[in-house]
Amino acid sequence: MRIGISGLQTTDLVAKSIKETLSDAGFESFYFKNNSKATLADLVIVLGGDRGVRNYLHSAIDVDTPVLGISESESNGVLAQIELKELPSYLNRIKKQDYVIEDVPRIGVKIDGKNTYPVLNDVSVFTSKSATLMEHILRINGEEVWHDSSDGVIISTPIGSSAYSMSAGGPIIFQAANVFGIIS
C-alpha cells in the first residue's frame, strides 16, 4: 500500500518522522505538496488538523483517494480524528483495511457561471451593502420550493453545520444525514 503524506504547514522533520514510522510498518510512502500526486496513493495522510484536511480537500477536487486527517497537537477535530502520536497504533488497522471510508458531502458553487472548488463547510451569499435585504429563491430541478427575503443566506453541509451556520441560528446536522442546511 502506498501512502501519500500532505500538509501545508508541515515541517520536514514531521514528514520525515512519519515516513520513517510508515516504513518501519512496511508501507511505501511519499510526501507531496502538489495534490495531482495524490492519485498515486492508496491512502493520503493529511497533517494540520481540521484546517489541513479542509485545505487539502478544497485543492484536491477530482481526487477520490481516502484521507486520514491527523492533528499534530493534542486536540482532535471533526475531520482530523487522530493525533500524530496515535498513528503507530492505527497502522495495523490500515494494513488489514480495518476502517470505514465515509463520503463527505460538498456543495458545488458557480460564480458568474464558472465552477469553483466544491465547498466542504458552507456557502454564504450576502448583499454588498450591509443591512440591505435581498430576495432569494430555492429551486430543485427547476421547481421553486422556497422563496425568502433576508440580508443573506447560508447553505451548509452537515460538517459545516456546527460552524458559521450554527452561529447564525442554524441547526446542527447529523454527519451521515443526506441534507444541507439553509439559513436565512
Located regions from the model:
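Short glycine-rich anion-binding loops that position phosphate/pyrophosphate groups of nucleotides
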Residues: 49-52, 73, 159-162
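Catalytic core of DAGKc-family lipid kinases
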Residues: 73-151
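Gly/Ser/Thr-rich active-site loops/lids in small-molecule metabolic enzymes
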Residues: 147-184
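ATP/NTP phosphate-donor binding region
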Residues: 1-47, 52-62, 82-103, 110-117
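Short beta-strand segments
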Residues: 46-48, 69-71, 156
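Proline-centered loop/turn at the N-terminus of a beta-strand
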Residues: 64-68
